Amino acid sequence: MHHIVEVDLGDRKITLETGKMAKQANGAVVVRSGDAVVLVTACMADQPKPSAGFFPLTVDYREYTYAAGKIPGGFIKREGRLSEKEVLTCRLIDRPIRPLFPEGFMNETQIIAMVLSADPEQDPNSLAIVGTAAALAISDIPFQYVMAGVRVGMRDGQYTANPTYTEGRASKLNIVVAGTEEGIVMVEAGAQEVSEAEVLGAIEFGHECCKKIAAGIRQLMKLCGKTKREFVSPVLDETIYAEVEKQARVDLTDALNTEKHEKLASYALVASVKKRTIEALPDEQKEQGAKCFDALKERIFRDDMLKKHRRPDGREFDQIRQITIETGVLPRVHGSTLFTRGETQALVTVTLGTKDDEQRIELLEPGEASKRFMLHYNFPPFSVGEVGFMRGAGRREIGHGALAERALTALIPGEDKFPYTMRVVSDTLESNGSSSMAAICGGSLALMQAGVPMTAHVGGVAMGLVMEGKDYAILTDIAGAEDHYGDMDFKVAGTRDGITGMQMDIKVPNITTAIMKEALEQARRGRLFILDKMYEAMPQANTAISQYAPRIYTLHIPTDKIRDVIGPGGKVIRGIIEQTGVKIDVEDDGTIHVASADEASANKAIQIISDLTATAEIGKTYLGKVVRLVDFGAFVEIFPGTDGLLHISEIAENRIKDVRDELKEGDQILVKCLALEGNKIKLSRKAVLKEQREKMKQGKE
């Protein structure tokens, strides 16, 4: 049957519809808001896939160009691989739902979200989260939670649910909040140096919106929800667990001590203890024994945190690992930094380019989009001592790069102050947790070292959480094991004045805003400590860019002169580029950017452009060239392509009968501009001769 439920979020209304489309899926919901329409389906395999080793959940989000009345650009007119925006939205959907599936559930599950109609003023990705939550809720998939997601904007201290593109661009804060009726499960944000209190207010506002949407989903469940398939999470054999614990606890506790052992040495010791312990078990117990060993490893970690109040490497809960910073480490690179924090190390480089180097983006929203600042994050296998393929960026790398880019964007100067395209690349050379935060810190340092006039450094810190019941421990600057066995990965980036980027993922059903408030304050203290180290290494941006970077010179011309610079079919501008070897970008408002690594070439191009676009000024003297003689005077070129009339009466101080007695074509003479009448320029040589004679007379006196 066809069912519709409407949710009111104040200025925005969301409609949930099911029973008309994709009826063979386990769950299918069409979400509408304005002209935006998103179809989300949830499907599950009948049999589990235990060989996967992890929950085999796949999320695919597609923004079809037909949704915006467009045809894909380029030669291939069919949608191809996912765009960066689509990949990030896949992660945005995956992260809040993954921890809510039952422990040990191994049936392949797939979420597909398709944007069928695009509203020119609304981002559909928050609707995709809502559709996913609704599709799972009404399906027979054993997903027991009702959750929702919402985008929150803030302007003039007021929070807005699902702001429009226009509102989002004007917003001081852009945050996506996902939560159940009981608490928060995921947060992702970009901001303009906002306070912790403002962020917390946005999260609380977003959670209230999530509750309203969840109530609508519950209403839909009552109308058409299927009976959930039975699933009981597997439990460990207590007898085998006790034997594994007896054999391994002492040695395993020592192996996990990273204050005593470095990361790779710890891994090797753990593997050795595991091998010895499992080999001692009967063959029929080995598979269960391996699971018991992994559970024991996690149990030791959590007991150390909550009962002994001790981290694996011996740090205090709010202590940050040792930081070392080197700037300018690569000679030919425009900007570079080697940032090391504990056993995590990032080599971050900056390349400066021109407007031609901007990243063009094809989006559903109207108009053309491009990026002049981009950050690319790489995670090669050697960073964790492994062998692997060097393929293109995966979803994780794209997600980490987007977080770092978002955190730094708030401090990137506008094009009017710094007309360069900037590409930051963060290569993770070593990793033991918080590598994305190393990308942010290293990126800020490398940008300043490259001469990008940022007004402040941006630092980042990853927070963790270990929680059981009412007991919990919040950790600052988490290492790899703390991320793996902990319950939260909460990344916070910003300046001394406020937060610019944030991302939170959890492995428990939800956390309260009270815990988030405490974590934000602890993160603020950690961020300030890191920023102090960064300012010691690079107090402010270099005043000059690298000698190997292109110099960009900016000049402004009248808009009616643009055609003179470009010429018919681009002939003139191509000629300037071929003659000087520079790059030239002309904007519609008459702004011209000339880029070249060679100053002389740039100056030559600027002079040509200045000559092409120059306008005569009354009373000013010019060195002109006689280009044509006529009976009533001569036409003199004072700028390339710009002639003025030198009347016969203005050629000499005495009366002349024939112009050719005084001038011939090709002569270079000094002339003064007497008057401007529309496009006509009146010149005088007589006035210049008179001035010269009077100066000579004064000199003799």
Curated annotation (Swiss-Prot):
S1 motif domain ranges (all copies): 619-686
Compartments it resides in: Cytoplasm
Enzyme class, UniProt record, top EC level: transferase
Reactions catalysed according to its record: RNA(n+1) + phosphate = RNA(n) + a ribonucleoside 5'-diphosphate
Annotated EC: 2.7.7.8
UniProt binding sites for Mg(2+): D483, D489
Main subcellular localisation: cytoplasm
CDD domains: KH-I_PNPase, RNase_PH_PNPase_1, RNase_PH_PNPase_2, S1_PNPase
A biological process term (GO) from this entry: mRNA catabolic process
One GO CC term on file: cytosol
Domain named KH: residues: 550-609
UniProt keyword annotations, A-Z: Cytoplasm, Magnesium, Metal-binding, Nucleotidyltransferase, RNA-binding, Transferase
HAMAP family: PNPase (MF_01595)
The protein's name: Polyribonucleotide nucleotidyltransferase
Annotated organism of origin: Solibacter usitatus (strain Ellin6076)
